[in-house]
């Protein structure tokens, strides 16, 4: 199927300021259209070959492919007993799953989407889990407040990614970790890598997960389509399908790079 001029324009805009302004309104629209009671995960699906063998509760099973992404990102380090901050937590599904299964001392989900945060606060009522509205580039927390910062997608929408990294360094305690998964178009890889290299955070691991995301999208396509068709108006249904098809195509063709990282804040970085 050929894409319309509007879709081709959005693809060319990439991560420009216009694109980022669009996404500031897209997520609240998704929240009002879908609701956290319908879709608790906004991240792309992920699956390995052979498949990840997670034991899930019955209520989590429909979200297995999205949970896989959270599980792989979060288990680079031990979360048990740690103070965890998730930046851009979406509808809170990942926060709920990780709180219930990995047992952090506390877990705070932050998002700029006011409607999304209200839904999270209503739905995900668990001991040690809380949600706050805030800006990823101006985190509303004291210095050295967290042991781990988790970031699954969305940073490609931030106007100033380097400011987010500076805020991560500020709120992490010495010896803490940034667990990070996101994607960039090929023409922005150099800038992405330069921002990461320019941060005081030290990289412990990195791997490209294009194949795993494509596999997850393919495996999850029917479930996602049913939910979207039931709950979104026609123009949003079309946009959602177009983005999914293009994402798979670009990942397979190398026009996008989807990566998973683990960073640490060395003690020297806090001096």
From Swiss-Prot:
Keyword Electron transport: no
EC number(s) given by UniProt: 2.1.1.-
UniProt keyword annotation of Coiled coil present: no
InterPro entries, per database record: Methyltransf_11, PthPhpthDimycoMt, SAM-dependent_MTases_sf
Keyword annotations: Lipid biosynthesis, Lipid metabolism, Methyltransferase, Transferase
Annotated S-S bridges: none
GO biological process: lipid metabolic process; methylation
Role this protein plays: Catalyzes the methylation of the lipid moiety of the intermediate compounds phthiotriol and glycosylated phenolphthiotriol dimycoserosates to form phthiocerol dimycocerosates (DIM A) and glycosylated phenolphthiocerol dimycocerosates (PGL).
Protein name: Phthiotriol/phenolphthiotriol dimycocerosates methyltransferase 1
Annotated source species: Mycobacterium ulcerans (strain Agy99)
């Amino acid at each position: 199927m050929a894409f319309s001029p509007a879709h081709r324009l959005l693809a060319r805009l990439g991560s420009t300021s216009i694109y980022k302004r669009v996404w500031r309104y897209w997520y609240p629209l998704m929240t009002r259209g879908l609701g956290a009671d319908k879709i608790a995960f906004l991240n792309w699906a992920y699956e390995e070959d052979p498949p990840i063998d997670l034991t899930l509760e019955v209520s989590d099973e429909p979200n297995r492919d999205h949970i896989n992404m959270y599980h792989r990102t979060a288990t680079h380090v031990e979360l048990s007993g740690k103070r965890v901050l998730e930046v851009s937590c979406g509808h809170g599904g990942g926060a709920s799953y990780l709180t219930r299964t990995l047992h952090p001392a506390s877990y705070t989900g932050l998002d700029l989407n006011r409607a999304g945060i209200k839904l999270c606060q209503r739905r995900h009522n668990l001991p040690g889990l809380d949600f706050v509205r805030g800006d990823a580039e101006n985190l509303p927390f004291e210095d050295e407040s967290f042991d781990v910062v988790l970031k699954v997608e969305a940073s490609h929408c931030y106007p100033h990614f380097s400011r987010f990294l500076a805020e991560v360094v500020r709120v992490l305690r010495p010896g803490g970790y940034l667990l990070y998964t996101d994607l960039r178009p090929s023409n922005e890889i150099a800038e992405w890598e330069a921002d990461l290299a320019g941060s005081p955070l030290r990289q412990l691991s990195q791997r490209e997960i294009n194949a795993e995301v494509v596999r997850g999208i393919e495996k999850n396509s029917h479930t996602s389509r049913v939910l979207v068709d039931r709950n979104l108006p026609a123009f949003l249904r079309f946009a959602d399908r177009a983005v999914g098809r293009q994402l798979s195509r670009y990942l397979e063709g190398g026009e996008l790079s989807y990566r998973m990282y683990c960073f640490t804040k060395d003690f020297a970085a806090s001096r």
